[in-house]
């Protein structure tokens, strides 16, 4: 990978040192609290005592969006939770309008799909050349849809679902070599984002990507002669990760305990063995031809091959499917049985809440969302009914998450138990959208090909290291104030002594102008070597370059610049202490005068870097 552009040494040292202090400072200002980033081993300081827990919220408070779009800051906060990041034009246009109307309109927008984009990249692969431009196509389409897609709510929901129903092309194996499989899977999630979870599970089950990833593609019935048994991988994860978990939950997501005070396990390995028989006989609809090429087999659902289907009875979770039932009917009955389980609503609802609003949701919040999931219907604040009335309606569930009083209350802005560490990937997309970075030609964003390492973001779309995602939903960070309170904080699982400076360096690179400040010839050689395509200089030099016109106009006034970035990036959540620290740092980056454009650019890059590495920004509330 190319050596990244480095800003001036003075700016770099100022940014790196202050950003590290801000990011590791624990409780720097109003955004830190109990969800702040844990200190790395290099920082030696006694941990402050945890604050007294706040009083519990009233039982079943009414859902409300009073003022959601009433002010620019409120609009920005709502869009931060619901999209890949607000833009200034969206905030200006939506402020004073109805958040309910916006939500309803988002449900009607056509989906921005991935497969058509991948097919364009596939057509660009040179004959007898390296197929990398197609291999990376799932990444390119993700960036384009996330940053420039008109269907922001749908795209954000699809990404949230991708962290529950995990398929990954990490590791350079088949799913990396055949991007069509993952691209089709991306579209399965995108199309079903506002649909029904039961239907989504069915489409996921038949998808070649999941069939390959969890090893039930080509799954065969038992053979008593050889001792062969059906593969149990998908059956286990379908229950454990995708639907009900492993222990009995109450409607609020809290574990149900037995008479000895122990959690109640939901199933045994016999249940997994019985369920595994359901997922036999599935394979791609067509096998490779004599040349070893795969036609469009990865772009269609898998089909049943009767000779491989288990003819044994399938018993699990107190459900029974008779012997000699074909695969399609077995899958229908199995998914219906699983969806009827009372754990599905709280188990899935809590994880979706974590992806949008708060990492450690109050049990009452979970129960209200789970109620909408079970009912399949939710009434928006303007009275519009969302959902079909069938259990598992995802549009109703998402509405319940975003419009719940816990999410919309102004008190959440100062509640140290509410909120979440921003996912690193969402920090980048917010930056790109806030500053209108050019994502029309994502193939030229050579530094964005793999962000899964701690030296970048520790997170890359559809590239989790395992089916357990980038982080576990029940993760409690040891040695932190949130951990001392028993709070779940999944994103802290990828925060460590490597990822903290890695993120700082990453965001600095783009904040200071990214590829536009690099050596064109070196960049062009890298693109040509990696992708084997003719290089378009204009596209290369404009890829993901920010438009700082508004910021440059404020560059000579450090305080005004920081106030602007606070509103744009953090919906006014930066504390006075944090803003003062950043202004002081900016004033040490001198500007010779109104005509010092280089000095202005340096100051803007420094300001963006410091805001986006501050704990006030890193914790979303």
Q: Residue ranges of each PLM-predicted region?
A:
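A Lys/Arg-rich helix-loop hairpin that forms a DNA/phosphate-binding surface
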Residues: 173-179
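Bacterial Sec-dependent N-terminal signal peptides
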Residues: 18, 22-64
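Structured, charged N-terminal subsegments at the starts of enzyme catalytic cores
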Residues: 129, 137, 141-152, 159
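His/Asp/Glu-rich metal/cofactor-coordinating catalytic motifs and the adjacent surface-exposed loops
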Residues: 61-130, 134-140, 179-349, 353-621
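Substrate-binding cleft and catalytic face of glycoside hydrolase catalytic domains
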Residues: 118-119, 157-162
């Amino acid at each position: 990978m190319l050596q990244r552009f480095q800003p001036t040494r003075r700016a770099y040292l100022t940014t790196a040192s202050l950003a590290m202090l801000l990011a590791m400072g624990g409780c720097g200002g109003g955004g830190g609290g109990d969800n702040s980033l844990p200190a790395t081993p290099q920082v030696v300081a006694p941990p402050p005592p945890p604050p007294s827990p706040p009083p519990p919220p009233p039982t079943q408070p009414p859902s409300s969006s009073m003022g959601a779009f009433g002010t620019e800051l409120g609009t920005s906060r709502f869009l931060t939770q619901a999209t890949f990041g607000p833009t200034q034009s969206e905030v200006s246009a939506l402020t004073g309008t109805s958040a309910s109307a916006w939500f309803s309109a988002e449900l009607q927008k056509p989906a921005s799909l991935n497969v058509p984009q991948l097919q364009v990249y596939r057509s660009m692969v040179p004959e007898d050349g390296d197929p990398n431009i197609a291999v990376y196509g799932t990444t390119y389409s993700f960036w384009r849809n996330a940053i420039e897609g008109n269907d922001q709510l749908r795209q954000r929901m699809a990404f949230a679902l991708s962290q529950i129903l995990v398929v990954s092309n990490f590791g350079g194996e088949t799913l990396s070599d055949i991007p069509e499989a993952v691209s089709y899977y991306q579209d399965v999630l995108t199309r079903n984002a506002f649909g029904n979870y039961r239907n989504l599970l069915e489409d996921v089950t038949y998808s070649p990507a999941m069939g390959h990833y969890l090893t039930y593609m080509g799954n065969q019935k038992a053979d008593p002669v050889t001792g062969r048994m059906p593969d149990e991988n998908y059956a286990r994860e379908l229950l454990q990760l995708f639907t009900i978990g492993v222990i009995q939950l109450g409607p609020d997501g809290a574990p149900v305990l037995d008479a000895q005070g122990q959690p109640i396990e939901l199933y045994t390995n016999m249940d997994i063995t019985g369920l595994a028989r359901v997922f036999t006989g599935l394979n791609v609809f067509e096998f490779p031809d004599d040349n070893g090429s795969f036609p469009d087999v990865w772009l269609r659902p898998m089909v049943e091959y009767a000779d491989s289907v288990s003819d044994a009875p399938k018993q699990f979770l107190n459900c029974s499917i008779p012997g000699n039932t074909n695969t399609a009917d077995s899958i229908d009955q199995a998914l219906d049985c699983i969806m009827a389980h009372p754990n599905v609503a709280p188990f899935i609802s809590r994880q979706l809440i974590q992806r949008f609003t708060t990492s450690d949701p109050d049990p009452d919040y979970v129960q209200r969302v789970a109620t909408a999931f079970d009912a399949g219907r939710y009434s928006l604040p303007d009275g519009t009914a969302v959902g079909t009335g069938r259990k598992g309606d995802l549009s109703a569930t998402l509405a319940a998450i975003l419009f719940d009083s816990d999410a919309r209350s102004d008190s959440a802005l100062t509640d140290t138990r509410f909120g979440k560490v921003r996912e690193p990937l969402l920090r980048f997309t917010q930056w790109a959208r806030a500053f209108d970075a050019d994502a029309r030609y994502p193939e030229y964003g050579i530094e964005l090909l793999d962000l899964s390492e701690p030296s970048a973001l520790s997170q890359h779309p559809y590239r989790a290291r395992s089916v357990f995602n980038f982080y576990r939903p029940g993760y409690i960070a040891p040695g932190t104030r949130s951990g001392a309170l028993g709070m779940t904080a999944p994103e802290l699982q990828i925060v460590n002594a490597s990822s903290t400076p890695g993120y700082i360096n990453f965001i600095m690179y783009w904040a200071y102008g990214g590829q536009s400040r690099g050596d064109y010839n070196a960049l062009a050689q890298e693109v040509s070597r990696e992708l084997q395509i003719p290089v378009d200089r204009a596209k290369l030099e404009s890829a993901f370059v920010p438009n700082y016109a508004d910021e440059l106009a404020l560059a000579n006034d450090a305080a005004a610049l920081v106030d602007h970035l606070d509103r744009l990036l953090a919906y006014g959540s930066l504390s006075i202490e944090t803003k003062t620290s950043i202004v002081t740092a900016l004033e040490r980056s001198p500007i010779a005068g109104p005509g010092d454009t280089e000095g202005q650019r340096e100051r803007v890059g420094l300001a963006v870097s410091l805001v986006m590495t501050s704990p006030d920004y890193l914790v979303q509330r």
